Amino acid sequence: FGTKTGSDPDNLKTAYYAFFSDLDNAQQLINDYIKSAPNNNTFADADILTQGGTYPEWIKFSNSLRLRLAMRISNVDRTKAEYEAKKALDPNNGGVLELSSEIIQVSGKNGYTNPLGEINKGWLEVHMNANMESYLLGYEDPRTQKYFEKSIEAYENEIDDNGNYVYGETRKDINYYGQYKGIRQGTGTTHNYYKGHSISTVTPNTPAILMTAAEVWFLRAEAALRGYVDAG
């Protein structure tokens, strides 16, 4: 943000107010188009974010974004946060994401590659943290298999004449094969030692999720707790 190259960046208040203004303008354009061509659905062919590519979906996405932004400024600008939250949750403005099927995500259908998936599968750099292992396994969370893969075999830490790691014999003291295993934060042990630990299930073909109805329900609950609205 700023007026020209090299200018001082806008402060946070200016930036957030600009976000709300952008949402106002975007929704007005969509609503105007709906009125002029109610039976057209020209978004569908090029839409890589919503499930059906319909105008109502984009209105819901816009309102949900507005609610997210409102909650982010609620501790520093209560008046503006309350105003924007009420606007987002006003049913006359088109509603927000409510159903589990209403997911805003970048689809891989048009060649998009999930960058986290590349880092995870290509570099093996997205591992389960030991704290996450403790929570998920301690509470027997059924979502564990959705988040992480089970550990694979680990190998001895060997280096060839050129200083590169090479696979050696399977470590005999590693007994977590086929289990969920996280990495302890702050460890100074080399990467190869932890190479077999649980990695994320995200792949290069996994859609990149930007917003879900689950988040919006939490935002609505926060708005209600703050006394902004009856958030349902």
Task: Indicate where each model-derived feature is located.
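Structured, solvent-exposed acidic/aromatic patches
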Residues: 1-232
